[in-house]
From Swiss-Prot:
This protein's UniProt keywords: Hydrolase
Substrates-to-products reaction catalysed: an acyl phosphate + H2O = a carboxylate + phosphate + H(+)
SUPFAM superfamilies (alphabetical): Acylphosphatase/BLUF domain-like (SSF54975)
Species of provenance: Geobacter metallireducens (strain ATCC 53774 / DSM 7210 / GS-15)
Similarity field: Belongs to the acylphosphatase family.
The protein, known as: Acylphosphatase
Name of the top EC class for this enzyme: hydrolase
Active site: 21, 39
Domain Acylphosphatase-like as annotated: residue spans: 6-93
Gene3D superfamilies hit by this protein: 3.30.70.100
Assigned EC number: 3.6.1.7
Cited PANTHER family: ACYLPHOSPHATASE
Highest taxon, organism lineage: Bacteria
Upper classification of the organism: Bacteria, Pseudomonadati, Thermodesulfobacteriota, Desulfuromonadia, Geobacterales
GO function terms (MF aspect): acylphosphatase activity
Amino acid sequence: MTMKIRAIVTVKGLVQGVAFRHHTVLQGNQLRVTGWVKNLPNGDVQGCFEGDETDVQALVEWCHHGPSRARVDRVIVERKSFRGEFDTFDVRY
């Protein structure tokens, strides 16, 4: 059985105004990851991803490049204990 994990991910670079959140939701849904993604006031994008470890890791890896118009400079990942608090993956405002 695959271990369930939670990751708090902060993506730095040109990641706002390039549909990063929208594409993160699409990727998350494809990977059966739950949680949220949002823009931060400083220009970063942050997400909380929960699911099977391999699926969450795949979404984190995708965040290293993001959608085609994005320019990712850095991805910071904080691994946390799985809480199982989400049923969906969506954009937060």
